């Protein structure tokens, strides 16, 4: 598997990534096109296209924060799901980052959310905050009640949430 960092919104892969991003994530869970474009000029953000056998199979959007990496979005394109690629990507992340944090819908939201939580737990993540609120991306969108997961058990989560709120959603 290859991980190609995309450094420009004009990269041809971004069209496929952004299209899938808009189709997969509900409007309240995603950035506008302008906000997405700005990710590429932020030095803390890394957008990766994930390739398997020279095919784009998905992407990661990560934020390198003070003491952890925050995975804002992680998607395997629909035609490549259920092939264990997600677990391979998580394994790759573990090799590169000791502390990883991400958000997910509560498992009682629907069957897909329950599967997603199960996937993350099987891959070493645990729920560290089940009262987490994802701030809205802009005033026309809603904040969301999500779960915060990590691959380690911090004593407190306030500092994690504070940095996510101040850097990712500012």
PLM features per residue range, with description:
Residues 103, 117, 121-141:
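Conserved catalytic-core motifs of GNAT/GCN5-like acyltransferases
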Residues 49, 55-75:
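Conserved beta-strand in the GNAT
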Residues 45, 143-148:
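Short hydrophobic/aromatic beta-strand or adjacent loop that forms the aromatic wall/cage
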Residues 1-31, 145-146, 155-170:
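Short amphipathic alpha-helix that is part of the acyltransferase structural core
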Residues 76, 82-95:
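Conserved acetyl-CoA-binding loop-helix of GNAT-fold acetyltransferases
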Residues 24-52:
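Active-site rim helix/loop that mediates acceptor-substrate recognition in acyltransferases
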Residues 96-112, 117:
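Conserved GNAT acetyl-CoA-binding A-motif
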